[in-house]
Amino acid sequence: YISPYKLWNKDLKNNFDTICVEHDEILNSDEGLIKWLELLHHTGIAIVKNAPVEEKSAFPLLNRISHVRETFFKTPFEVINIPKPNNSAYTAHALRNHMDLPWFELPPGYQFLHCLINSADGGDSSGVDGFAVAEHLKNNEREIFDTLVNVPLKFRDMDYTQESHRGFHAPAISLTKDGDFHDIRFSVATMDVLDCHPDLMEKVYKAHRLFGRLLHDEKFQINFRLEPGDIYSF
């Protein structure tokens, strides 16, 4: 089985309206729900517009898909600037492109960032199609692609507010049994020391460096600003 996923790049910004769907349309009609789900399944990104801006007001919408997964970050997880942060999300610093919780055995299937307020300078969002980058490597840098698929990386979360550390080994690019893309794991902030055979280390460093550079290349990336009431779904 090969999914109907549509790879995209920076040109998606020129058709940004095509990935937007109204909150009330999703909440009140199966047609709106299907439109949202197809965007997520086929494109991997969607912006829900004109949602309420009260805390937890997105839950009725999310429950149209499934239950919300609980984590130790609390539900919902608030992306705010706090003193003595235990996570880079709790700072005003720009975040590099990454995927969340790569040290989970099963990282989130979908995530939803609900913008309640965005009045500060900066605060723009970005999106990158990791599968498009993987496809580029598959077609143009096969040795690097194979390294990213075949050599597991070590991810670890060491949070000073938690009693335990969490870690997991997984490749940067995972494939299904049919050779289709399954998931991407990229997070410099939670990548641990390399845990591979010494003969592979130089090759792994080279592969991960190129992968990271391409994941931040403008030709694969879109940038936009979330407005209050937007829900960034991916």
Language-model region placement:
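Extended acidic/polar, glycine-enriched regions
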Residues: Y1-T18
